[in-house]
Amino acid sequence: MNDLRKETDSLGEVNVPADKLWGAQTQRSLEHFSIGRDLMPREMIQSYAILKKAAANANYAGGRLDGKIHKLIVHTCDEILAGQHHDMFPLHVWMTGSGTQFNMNVNEVISNRCCQLAGTALGSKLPVHPNDHVNMSQSSNDSFPSAMYIAAAMNVTQRLVPAVEALHDAIAAKSNQWDDIVKIGRTHMQDATPLTLGQEWSGYAAMLADGLARIDDALKGVFRLALGGTAVGTGINAAPGFAEAVAAEIARLTGLPFVSAPNKFAVQGAHDALVQLSGTLRTLAGSLYKIANDIRLLSCGPRAGFAELRIPENEPGSSIMPGKVNPTQAEALTMIAVQVMANDVAVGFGGAGGYLEMNVYKPLIIHNIAQSVTILTDGCTNFRTFLVEGTEPNRKKIKEYVERSLMLVTALAPVIGYDKASRIAHYAMDNDLTLKSAALKLGFVTEPEFDRIVDPAKMVKPYVAEIKVPLAIGAKTG
């Protein structure tokens, strides 16, 4: 059995494992809220270390924090930022809605590590007290949401955005490479007029670019921090100027444009900026779902489907059917998209859970956003690396579909009229003819007219056929 030590808080003594850096309040949370397997996101450990370091710097600069205590706190925060002590943050997501227990977990770990560095006993709170020093000028009610915003912003800008940009660039490169491949378009899952494969993929690239722009716009609100609002947004126990100073310090430490929120009541009673950010993740997920499904559909086959695209073989596709290749990267990405959409529903409900001066669904919100960002990042990277970059067109099959398509008749409509063009398409279908054969049999155009007007390469951009020679008998309506 592990040795224990006594730690104290306002409720009395608590037994804590002797080798752990956390204190009484963390231990109480472990005993009362060990629910499920979801731990607080690792990103929150890092963001809180940044926040506590910035607060110590601001309090020291403001003359409120002793120099030796300041150095101990900063040193410990730097250790955490370097990846040390992460096993000292064991709390589960499903705790108090304010995140107070996690804030105290951070305060206690920093305090006890400072005690170790100073050569004093764990739990002595000397020379660094978890509340008086580490939590100086703060409340859980403003520090936890600020840590949420820092974690979300860093995770999005440092991980998700580069991953989406790389996927966008890979798709855009394919679009440019395939701009000369004319293929048949499809609407309602039925044949439509032609476009190029490059144009089709340019749409995918544009969707991702738009998604990145939406995320960038949403981040503007996430950069506004609650820190300095303390308990209810008034700033009680925070010195004048602390809010602005600590936000500037966080901006310096992260390289991101964090500022003090102009109205602390709004960002402590609600977290609309994170709800908006989650909405942009949901929109991105919807785009990825469409892109993955399109590629999955166009690659279906190889002999009884569209088979317009050849996708890489990641692994054997079946335990019973030899030689089968499945679009597993597309399937994985669509599952990720569904999970992100579900997470957004939770974030939306959580964001609405602001009662009076404080939102009480904070851990739920950051848990779901952190998961969404992580799986979107990894999903985009895998989809690019193991599918997009290795995908190739089946030019023979694409050409065959274009030549067989009845919807090329659309180019004839401005010349012979919609009704006659429709008759050609139906006649070709009913008699198993090519479009050209049907048009000539009905006598609506001559062969030279058909060849000039019905040119798939012309139809991939704005194009209206002109009448340059007398039309065949019966071509004009009336």
Swiss-Prot record:
GO cellular component: cytoplasm
GO MF annotations, alphabetized: fumarate hydratase activity
Catalytic residues as annotated in Swiss-Prot or TrEMBL: 188, 318
Pfam families assigned: FumaraseC_C (PF10415), Lyase_1 (PF00206)
Annotated EC: 4.2.1.2
Binding site for substrate: 98-100, 129-132, 139-141, 187, 319, 324-326
Residues at the site labelled Important for catalytic activity: 331
Associated pathway: Carbohydrate metabolism; tricarboxylic acid cycle; (S)-malate from fumarate: step 1/1
Swiss-Prot/TrEMBL catalytic activity: (S)-malate = fumarate + H2O
Enzyme class label: lyase
Main location: cytoplasm
Superkingdom, taxonomy of origin: Bacteria
Subunit note: Homotetramer.
Task of the protein: Involved in the TCA cycle. Catalyzes the stereospecific interconversion of fumarate to L-malate.
Family affiliation: Belongs to the class-II fumarase/aspartase family. Fumarase subfamily.
Extra remark beyond the main annotation: There are 2 substrate-binding sites: the catalytic A site, and the non-catalytic B site that may play a role in the transfer of substrate or product between the active site and the solvent. Alternatively, the B site may bind allosteric effectors.
Protein name, UniProt field: Fumarate hydratase class II 1
